[in-house]
Amino acid sequence: MQIPLIITLSLHVLSSVFWAGSSFTLARTGGLGGEKLFRPQMGAAVIAILTGAYLGHLVHAGVFGTAEKILAVGAFAALVAAGVQGAIGGRAIASLRRGTADEAGARSRIAVAQRIAAVLLAVTAVCMGAARYA
């Protein structure tokens, strides 16, 4: 059982670091380059969420104590972050590609989506760290 745990944890950490790191960077740069990173970010988000759910199954099955409640808050924040990036950022990027939106307005929406997601992913990271010691 250790090999699946190690592989899942590694995939979770790598995808989460890319997702959060790129979100923090795009939030800081005003979303500049967001259209190029949208698909990789959403791919990393899917992998992070799926591996996180599987880790919950492997490590926390049958228990819902304080640590699991903290992890649930973090998981919810990650889901909302993915939704914000997908809905707000994705629509803005799609309108840029179609040429149907004001470029400044679309870039502003991308930046806002990344800033909201960055805060939510910071909450997620804090929850993962705190759950370890709960």
Where do the model's predicted regions map?
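Polytopic transmembrane helical bundles with strong interfacial aromatic enrichment
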Residues: 1-134
